[in-house]
Amino acid sequence: MRCPFCHNEDTQVLDTRVSDEGDTIRRRRRCAKCDKRFTTYERVELALPAIVKKNGSRVEYSHDKLASSIKLALRKRSVSSDSVDESIARIEEKLLSFGEKEIPSERVGELVMRELKRLDKVAYIRFASVYRSFADIESFESALKELK
């Protein structure tokens, strides 16, 4: 592991610990050259599928984009950030469980709507109105009836 201070390649591991969740290893290291200490984290990198948009273009999956979309729908709603993080984790687990290299954006949108419906009905309607491109009041009424 290269030292972030002097870029020397010779470093020594002083301490190794597994996180409480068991999915990350924390290593405390010391540089043999400059003697500075630093911490590294090791975790399994899971390859989430590429997203195929409606126009056929492909984009890399973005955790940040998913999180910002959900948070935008939940803006000014009383939903804890832990609940949001758990929902995002469930969506990502579902995407991984499909075992596909590519997945249509519509499928991701449906997963988001399912989670929002569980978290907050108002956020669900907000997201659905944009995602489903509601054009009129009848579209809103139809979505509201689905919630009842």
UniProtKB/Swiss-Prot annotation:
Stored HAMAP family: NrdR (MF_00440)
Role description: Negatively regulates transcription of bacterial ribonucleotide reductase nrd genes and operons by binding to NrdR-boxes.
Keyword Cell wall biogenesis/degradation carried by entry: no
GO biological process, one term: negative regulation of DNA-templated transcription
A Pfam family of this chain: ATP-cone
Gene: nrdR
Ranges of residues in domain ATP-cone: 49-139
Organism, as annotated: Polynucleobacter necessarius subsp. necessarius (strain STIR1)
A GO molecular-function annotation: ATP binding
Names of required cofactors: Zn(2+)
Entry protein name: Transcriptional repressor NrdR
Key words, A-Z: ATP-binding, DNA-binding, Metal-binding, Nucleotide-binding, Repressor, Transcription, Transcription regulation, Zinc, Zinc-finger
Family: Belongs to the NrdR family.
InterPro entries on file: ATP-cone_dom (IPR005144), NrdR-like_N (IPR055173), RNR_NrdR-like (IPR003796)
ZnF bounds (unnamed): 3-34
Cofactor binding: number and manner: Binds 1 zinc ion.
